From Swiss-Prot:
EC number: 4.1.2.4
GO-annotated biological processes: 2-deoxyribose 1-phosphate catabolic process; carbohydrate catabolic process; deoxyribonucleotide catabolic process
Keywords linked to the UniProt accession: Cytoplasm, Lyase, Schiff base
Protein name per UniProt: Deoxyribose-phosphate aldolase
One cellular-component annotation, GO: cytoplasm
Pathway: Carbohydrate degradation; 2-deoxy-D-ribose 1-phosphate degradation; D-glyceraldehyde 3-phosphate and acetaldehyde from 2-deoxy-alpha-D-ribose 1-phosphate: step 2/2
A molecular function GO annotation: deoxyribose-phosphate aldolase activity
Predominant place of localization: cytoplasm
Catalysed reaction equations from the record: 2-deoxy-D-ribose 5-phosphate = D-glyceraldehyde 3-phosphate + acetaldehyde
Subcellular locations according to the entry: Cytoplasm
Residues annotated as catalytic: 95, 156, 184
Family to which this protein belongs: Belongs to the DeoC/FbaB aldolase family. DeoC type 1 subfamily.
InterPro entries: Aldolase_TIM, DeoC, DeoC/FbaB/LacD_aldolase, DeoC_typeI
Length: 217
């Protein structure tokens, strides 16, 4: 076996089930797979956080959920309530979509307040979703600067609704953030080869619903 085959992807993976049609059986399957493969976390819709916590409470697998998903265009008070409710339900990681409209119009202060309040009030790991596929280079730089100032723990490339992670964007986020935070690549990660390329580019976490495919060597 090669070094490529032996590399353990499991600690990098947020095993994702964000299908709005998902049932309890789907969540049970997702959590069971995460426990079996020892993935870093599961990422589920807010309505399923309590269920995931109950299923995984005896395991080291973290429970993550999404906030302001997928548009980021919720009011700041709605996002904060959603985040606090998720944490009260047991989530220890939050993937929060930043307000892209405010970013594009240059309203940096509003974008900052929107994400900073969640970091400050919840005290858990916050991953800011930047939706890099719809941003210019200048907007990516601005988004990174704002999110670093706000206190996020990770920068996340994408929701997966407007395209996915690219090696180029992962490299860029790593460079712009100067290694101060983790980088989560998400969206369209379907093969082991893709996963390894993204990790080599600087990704420290991978969000994918195709986790089991990535584990095949």
């Amino acid at each position: 076996m090669t070094e490529h085959d032996l590399f353990d992807l499991a600690p990098y993976i947020d095993h994702t089930q964000l299908d709005p049609l998902a049932t309890r059986a789907d969540i049970e399957r997702c959590c069971g797979e995460a426990e079996q493969w020892k993935f870093a976390a599961v990422c589920v819709m807010p309505v399923w956080v309590k269920t995931a916590v109950q299923l995984l409470h005896r395991t080291p697998v973290k429970v993550c959920t999404v906030i302001g998903f997928p548009s980021g265009a919720h009011t700041s008070s709605t996002k904060l309530y959603e985040a606090q409710e998720a944490v009260d339900s047991g989530a220890t990681e939050l993937d929060v979509v930043i307000n892209l409209g405010w970013l594009k119009e240059g309203n940096s202060e509003a974008v900052y307040r929107d994400i900073a309040q969640i970091c400050a009030e919840t005290g858990v790991t916050v991953k800011a979703i930047l939706e890099t596929t719809v941003l210019t280079e200048e907007e990516k730089q601005l988004a990174v600067d704002i999110c670093l100032d706000a206190g996020v723990a990770f920068l996340k490339t994408s929701t997966g609704w407007r395209g996915g992670a690219t090696v180029a964007d992962v490299r860029l986020l790593k460079r712009l953030s100067r290694d101060r935070v983790g980088i989560k690549a998400s969206g369209g990660i379907r093969t082991r080869e893709q996963a390894l390329e993204l990790i080599n580019a600087g990704a420290t976490r991978l969000g994918t619903s195709r986790s089991l495919d990535l584990m095949q060597v």
